Amino acid sequence: EEVESFDLVILNAGVLGKIKDMQDCSIEELRETMEVNVWSNKWILDTCFSGGRNIKQVIGISSGASLSGSRGWNGYSLSKAALNMLIKLYSGECPSTHFTSFAPGLVDTAMQDYMTNLPEDPRYAPIEILKAAKGTEAMPSGYECAKKLIDAFPSLLENESGGYADIRKL
């Protein structure tokens, strides 16, 4: 049976890549990150909207890294900034759907395990902030974060479609 509409579509594709300077990243590494973090989400949206399906709300899981431009976050920051723009562009094309790029804050995931196990490097200062947050309320488990996100989703409808929100600022 064909689905005619969706109440909520959550786009949660994300790979980090290696923490290193942008000039040390190959185009291929950046392309792979963009493929997962941006283009897979475009494919999902196009598939969901195909056949004239209606969608009430789309939430693209973004990151504070999409705005910060912190050294070392290279393709991840670039791809999450591109995801923010993808969400904004779709919001202009699909005015009956509410779109939000939504940063979940720090979440204790395999990505955090990788970053918090990196050796100290003064070039990548934000890593030390993550290390300090690991194992505290500032970095909840995926399950705890999911509960907070689900509770926050309805309030995002009050914001302008196509915008960016960070759970830490709600």
State the predicted function of each range:
Residues 23-42, 83:
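Catalytic Tyr-X3-Lys loop
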Residues 101-102, 120-170:
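C-terminal helical subdomain
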